[in-house]
Structure formats: C-alpha cells, structure tokens
Amino acid sequence: MTETNKKIFISAGESSGDIHGANLMRCLLERNPNVTFYGLGKENMRQAGLHSLHDMSKKSLMWLHALTEISTFWKIKKECVSFFRRERPGVVILIDYCGFNFHLARAAKKLGIPVVYYVCPQIWAHGPWRVKKMKKLVDKVIVIYPFEKSFYDKAGVPSVYAGHPLFDEIS
C-alpha cells in the first residue's frame, strides 16, 4: 500500500473472521488513521469502520449453506472485482474462508493488487497440497500458530507470525 493509496479491501466470510477483521482494522487505524476500509464483513467490521460492499450479516459462508446461495456469492464476487478495477485498493486482506476468498485473491492478483491472507485456512491439516495454490495467490500470509510459519516458509510463501487473536484478548 502506498502513501497515496490508503484504501484497504478486507473480506471475512464467517462470524469469527468478522471479529478478527474488526480487531485488525482497529490496529491498522491506530497506526494510520487515514486508512479507509472497504469490503465484506458483518456487524463487528462495520462498527470498526468498514464501508461494506454487500450486507453479509444474513449470509452464511459455511460449506453447505453456501451451496444454496452460489449465484448470490457469484454476484458478490463480481461486485468485488468491479471494485478492484474501479478503486484499485492498495492491498486486499483476506480472512479465513478460502472457498470464497481464493476467488477474490485470484482476481486481485490478476490486477496486480497485493494480497495478504490473515488467519489462513488450515490447509496444513485439510489439504497440504493446497499450499501451492496459496503461493500463487497471495503475497504474504499472517499466521496465528507458530508452526504455521515454518509450514509456509518451507513452501516458499512469505509469512509473518502474529500470534492468536483470542490469546491476545484473554491476556
């Protein structure tokens, strides 16, 4: 993200991602109060300052529910890609839910927009072969478990260990 482009696109599909996204937004705003957030989230992210492209509060991005609304999610993806083309955000931050967010990552990469994945999908447990896809689609991952950093480093995916957001809230 450049000094002149302070637009951040951020996408969280599930309620837990919405909480993590809101916390991340607050942290980024503390560092730079001139940043503006656009994207997909729910109530927590809207309260933290998200300019929502689509009301996701009644949408479920969990696997079985998402299948029943596939045409809706296709339209939402198209809205996001139009936003990428029109507004050219400085960075796209994706939170969990690779089933939808990988599509956004692919579109952003094609347009030359940097992609950061925060709270990565647990591909180390549910399909380690997908790390190749992650390497192609993202510029950096921000991981929450210490072992994830070495997993991504070995695969050649630039990574930063941030710690688990829940542990920060507890301590």
Question: What is each model feature region?
Answer:
Residues 1-3:
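Short, flexible hinge/linker loops that cap or flank conserved catalytic cores
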Residues 6-171:
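Active-site and donor-binding regions of nucleotide-sugar-utilizing enzymes
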